[in-house]
Amino acid sequence: EYDLDDIIQGSTPLIMVLENIQDPGNLGTIVRTGEGAGITGVIMSNGTVDIYNPKTIRATMGSIYRVPFCYAENMQAVMQKLKKCKIQTYAAYLEGSSVHDAQNYKEATAFLIGNEGNGLTRELAESADWRIRIPMCGKVESLNAGIASAILMYEAQRQRRN
């Protein structure tokens, strides 16, 4: 069992903040990929699918036992805590004003990922320090939550490696 304080500790945490993710496979993929990318934890809104769902557990391929996670009742309180701890928050948002790879993720970072159908709530997105978007070609409007998370986490890992 972890709590919010466990997840945000450390000098340069890399955190995934998930709002109302519904697909167990997506949640499991985010946790598994997150471990590979070096995240320090996952914070989930109460509206997110149960992490102990059998499909989620299978999709994590064991990462559920190694990546700290917690559920949060009040996402605005989470955002206030992240800001207080000087963790930069980046909302993955279709209307983001900045391209994801134009930011610096070498410092304490939290990525906000929203629900598969609706994305982040406007309230949560607007409470982030930055609203970022992943540029896309063709007529694709958005990416799967697990894929978008992977792109952001590995961009942070790439920057931190160099």
Predicted features and spans:
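Active-site/binding-pocket entry motifs
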Residues: E1-D3, N118, R158
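RNA substrate-binding interface of SAM-dependent RNA methyltransferases
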Residues: E1-G96
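Poly-acidic low-complexity segments
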Residues: D23, N74, N104, E141-N144
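Structured adenosyl-cofactor binding patch, chiefly the S-adenosyl-L-methionine
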Residues: G36-A37, I51, T56-I64, R122-N162
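Active-site/ligand-binding-proximal alpha/beta "capping" segment
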Residues: Y90-V140
